[in-house]
Amino acid sequence: FDLTAGNLGLLAGGYFIGFSLMQIPVGLLLDKIGPKKVIGYFLIIALIGTISFALAKSFTGLFVSRIFIGVGVSACMMGPLTGYRVWFAEKYQQRANSWMLMVANIGFVSSTLPVQILLPYIGWRWIFILIAILILFSLILIFLLIPNWEQKESTSIKSEKESLSQIWKNKFFISMIPLAFINYGGIQAIQTLWAGPWMLNITGYTPLQSATGLFWINITMLISFFIWGYILPKISEYGISSIKLIKLGLPISYFSLFLIIYFGNNAGAFLFTLYIMTSIVISLTQPAIALNFSKNLAG
């Protein structure tokens, strides 16, 4: 396929459309039947989407497949967070979240330099077939290892609407919306979509240099999340809350972003690494929101 920058943007958008549209239904399902079933069933959709993407013959096929993948993995973040809210004590919520994101960055790392090395030998279609095999392996582990969930009694549509209303009216939840929409969304867009093309087309990196830059960006994130998860419970013992850490960290994150803008064509892997690493405090919003509600609304 001879894809333009606009086509690549649409493919990324298709993924996020599928992912975002499912968040409310996924949340309701997580509270009802738990992470094991929800993640498992949705990953079957991701498996179908991944195989479909590998076999696609047109841009439309790629786009629809990306939507399926987005829908399929839509429970992969909130599912674990819902489980952690029930399975772990409050003081370990931030650690569990950080270490989950650390594991997620293994996926980001594998999609950079390793993929760049494999592409000339097996092509992108076989790479997606390999991803499908890994998804199937994950499904087996999920159904074998994740604890069962205590089944809730069937709730009416009215009670579900009331629970959603309770969340949307919560002042703390409302205060976190801009961070999720602007900061977290921006970080995801830069890390997963725009850092690579920027280094390739603006900074003048070769494809291998760009992939290597992304590799080290994600390695840094992986290490940062590990350290972050280790020290967070210790920091909380000194009375330093998640919100205070976010307030301290955001200005540093904004300054790092300003440096990328200032250096423009010369902004390479180091500055992108600095920005994404200093934005790690945004990850604290997810467990902070979960802890602001009762366990039965964790999803």
Predicted regions and their residues:
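Cytoplasmic helix-loop-helix junction between adjacent transmembrane helices
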Residues: 59, 65-103
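C-terminal transmembrane helical hairpin of 12-TM major facilitator-type secondary transporters
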Residues: 240-285
